[in-house]
Amino acid sequence: MHGLMWIFAHSLWLYKANTYTRSSSLYTMTIPLILASKSKPRRDILFHAGICPTIRVSHVDEDAVLARAAQEHGITVDELPIDTKVMLLAEAKALAVYEAYLAVAKTAREARGECVTGHPLDAVTPDDPAAALAGDARAETQTRDFSNVRIPRTVEPLQQALAAEGRGLTAAGVGPLILGCDSMFLLDGKAYGKPHTPEVARERLRRMSGATGELWTGHCLLDFATGRVAKGTSKATLHFSKFSDVMIERYIATGEPLEVAGSFTLDGFGGAFIEGIEGDPSGIIGLSLPLARQLTEQLGVEWTDLWNVTRDERFVVDAPNNGGKLPPKGNVHQPGDGWVDCACGRKHWGTNGAAGVLLARRDTQTGEVTHIVMQHRAAWSAEGGTWGIPGGAIADGENTIEGALRESFEEANITPEDIEVVGSYCEDHGPWSYTTVFAFEKPGHEVHPRANDDESMEIMWVPIDEVPDRKLLTAMRTDWPSFERRLRALAVEHKGE
């Protein structure tokens, strides 16, 4: 069994009978949308249409997908029709992300052990000196140091704590929806993807000068809860002006045409040289809003159920002062990202809270913990330059374990299928919390950590005895002694497993 049919066999355990309820004419919950693409134009189209998607890059080998399809049909890749090509790639991207989320959901579902919750604010007074900001502009995003506070704690089974959250990938009857897209440009009967190099872009732009071509975009929308799939293609005809050699060279110098299908954009530098279009403008940018809406409705979901951005939010950048350091230009904004004014007197990242994975490696003979995965935080981040564990904001619709697993993969390549969750610690501040998820590599499995995004300077296995020698994130410095004791105790508890 393979391809999209495989989804249904692996989706049966996901489906539950609960449904969303209406309040007046609107749903009371937003259904999350996951975009299987790192394309900024596609993200922007959705964002300005009121949808902030979770971004999950598929890492699909596009050449291999097309080569395999051509071989199955006994033809060459060039003989595959353009609508078939874009549809195959859109399906492959959606399916790859679906499988990645299945792995996250499975590991979270199999999580065991105890959830220990600390309530530090119950042990301090509102006028505690530690609540005041230190005068440094960076202090507002620096975690308070509770190392000298006797923190009240509660303990409950981890799965019981997750059930109490009332959210998660397997907790909904609908969604999240996963959208895969792929675009190609057809000129003189030949399909073109991204040129990647200036030389290829130059040759293509010269052929496009004064010509007419077609932009095709495949869309595959998949409902994670039910495994249902809807798919379709959009097409638009474009008429180009004459391009001078000067224009071509200057356009290539912008870098814009190198990483877009057909070597041009409607919403960028190239837009002024498109003299006319017939068809859907958003499809030319890489995601047809009308088609995406139609596919959503085919799955029985209202398009407006995906709205999770207010009109004002579409034009506001929420960025507290961090000593003048700003995130990279291409940094991705996800649903759940944002600063919370916490009761502790500081700002914390994650409107749904935040979570990370404390992954430990054990000696194969003794079972003792030898290393943990650590993240050297990017300079632009809160407390940049310090060491902690990979993690971040919990996205809409995720529970804490799922959020930690997704974030740790995105940041550090901690693959969920290779680890087992054995407990957690939640520091609860009331309106915000951070959950540290304790995990071991599965027996016979290895995790190969690396920096997957711009939020880390480096990711590495660090010997457990050397952790205190690093410049640690405030919360990590405070919690590490108890975390180390718990990791060692968990290793004894799970010895031989």
Tell me the role of every PLM-derived stretch:
Residues S11, S23-S25, S147:
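Serine residues within intrinsically disordered or low-complexity segments
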Residues T30-I51:
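N-terminal beta1-alpha1 ligand-phosphate binding loop
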Residues T30-L33, E72-F315:
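Anionic-ligand binding patches
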Residues P53-E62:
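A short beta-strand-loop structural module common to alpha/beta enzyme folds
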Residues A132-L133, E313-T386, G392-H445, A489-E497:
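N-terminal leader/linker segments that precede catalytic domains of diphosphate-processing enzymes
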Residues H239-S241, H448-A489:
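NUDIX/MutT-family hydrolases
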